[in-house]
Swiss-Prot record:
One of its GO terms (cellular component) is cytosol. Zn(2+) binds at H279, H343. Its EC number is 4.1.99.17. Substrate binds at N80, M109, Y139, H175, S195, R196, G197, D236, S237, L238, R239, E275, Y302. This is Phosphomethylpyrimidine synthase. The lineage of its organism: Bacteria, Bacillati, Cyanobacteriota, Cyanophyceae, Oscillatoriophycideae. Pathway: Cofactor biosynthesis; thiamine diphosphate biosynthesis.
Length: 460
């Protein structure tokens, strides 16, 4: 599909969607996204031009089905996958990718740090993925120097970033916002720096007593991104790792820098979204979303969670989905899922499923709350099917049809029960939805009530 779209653009100095949007050009990707979002192509173009919406679409990711991330579009969900030195391999990661796409992931990030040849893993994932792929290139940079962070050079970072761009990565987390002057601000934290990429950059700066090389070489990264239409996902290296640390001076200092970098990228027509926390109490979530919009000139916000409490290891897909729903309601554009394994280990396929469904619920709830066009249509369809005891239609409309059917069939497995007017909760005699209040009955009742009211008005 995209082969024909991108062919005329190849060799141009800037092939970004923002570059075309600012020239008044509606690209094929914009038209495609407009249909998916039930919005006009001109609205999509104008939102991209002003930086409030991005279409992450590397010109080398040819099997991509373009999608939008921004406040005008539906709230999106990202799923993280990736092999580690201690667990997983390329086949397991491809299984996770297929599962993530099956259950509705809008984008997928490959966070591989080991488990095989990172280039082969990444290429296989991109070639198999119809959704945008994001990466964190700093991980491979560290792997290239065998974990000796202090040996990394700016050229090492730029080489890996160019490699990822050439392979077709649609967006990259770039940890350019953490500055050497920010590091003293973390000393009052309970959990310090919890971003892997942020920790790597912090260690490098502490060793060399030099400024963040991703910050000092930001313009060179921009030039790479222009050539391939890679979108920035500006990493929040100083995101809070516990609710105690939320909204502190370190987080907000970096956020201000991220806003400056956003506008710098926009000067070159490069698309940007900004990453956010993390661990945030419920009463601080609105502040965090509004503060990001203010500091980053309304660039799309992409948050991890946030978790609203720290005491539920094994259930952090729930603690974070609560925060994610609120963040989406307040205007966050994309939610990065959290699995039940968060803080405990590398997620397996079932963890990916559970985390993703929790976040699809959160994103959908946010769409309903923000009154996005058509957001509640599926809910209404399912409610009608439920009222009519159309079990198969209910399963079909569910976010996880397999799970819905599995739970129903645990107690009523026979096909005959797919037409039954009850489930095992209430049984055949106590289901309230069996009480069908039809139009004729209502008409008779209204006549009766009217007569009663008339009698009450009659003088004694």
């Amino acid at each position: 599909m995209r082969q024909e779209w991108v062919a005329p653009r190849r060799g141009q100095a800037n092939v970004s969607q923002m570059h075309y949007a600012r020239q008044g050009i509606i690209t094929e990707e914009m038209t495609y996204v407009a249909k998916r979002e039930n919005l006009s192509p001109e609205l999509i173009r104008s939102e991209i031009a002003r930086g409030r919406l991005i279409i992450p679409a590397n010109i080398n990711h040819l099997n991509l089905e373009p999608m939008a991330i921004g406040i005008a579009s539906k709230c999106k969900v990202n799923a993280n996958i990736g092999a580690s030195p201690n667990s997983s391999n390329i086949n397991e990661e491809l299984e996770k990718l297929h599962l993530a796409v099956k259950y509705g992931a809008d984008t997928v990030m490959d966070l591989s740090t080991g488990g095989g040849n990172l280039d082969e893993i990444r290429t296989a994932i991109i070639n198999a993925s119809p959704v945008p792929i994001g990466t964190v290139p700093i991980y491979q940079a560290v792997e290239s120097v065998h974990g000796n962070i202090e040996k990394l050079t700016p050229e090492d970072f730029l080489h890996i970033i160019e490699k990822h761009a050439g392979q077709g990565v649609d967006y990259m987390t770039i940890h350019a916002g953490i500055l050497i002057e920010h590091l003293p601000l973390v000393k009052t934290r309970l959990t310090g720096i919890v971003s892997r990429g942020g920790g790597i950059i912090a260690k490098w700066m502490l060793h060399h007593h030099k400024q963040n090389p991703l910050y000092t070489h930001f313009d060179e990264i921009i030039e790479i991104f222009k050539r391939y239409d890679v979108s920035f996902s500006l990493g929040d290296s100083l995101r809070p790792g516990c609710t105690h640390d939320a909204s502190d001076a370190a987080q907000l200092a970096e956020l201000k820098t991220l806003g400056q970098l956003t506008r710098r990228a926009w000067e070159h027509d490069v698309q940007v979204m900004v990453e956010g926390p993390g661990h945030v109490p419920m009463d601080q979530i609105e502040f965090n979303v509004k503060k990001q919009m203010e500091e980053c000139s309304e660039a799309p916000f992409y948050v991890l969670g946030p978790l609203v409490t720290d005491i539920a290891p094994g259930y952090d897909h729930i603690t974070s989905a609560i925060g994610a729903a609120l963040a989406g309601w307040y205007g966050t554009a994309m939610l990065c899922y959290v699995t039940p394994k968060e803080h405990l280990g590398l997620p397996n396929a079932e963890d990916v499923r559970n985390g993703l469904i929790a976040y699809k619920i959160a994103a959908h709830a946010a769409d309903i709350a923000r009154h996005r066009p058509g957001a509640r249509d599926r809910d209404d369809e399912l409610s009608i099917a439920r009222y009519n005891f159309d079990w198969n239609r209910q399963f079909q409309l569910s976010l996880d049809p397999d799970r819905a059917k599995e739970y129903h069939d645990e107690t009523l497995p026979a096909d005959i029960y797919k037409t039954a007017e009850f489930c095992s909760m209430c049984g055949p005699k106590f289901c309230p939805m069996q009480t069908k209040v039809d139009a004729d009955a209502i008409t008779e009742l209204e006549k009766f009530l009217a007569s009663q009211n008339q009698d009450n008005l009659t003088p004694v």
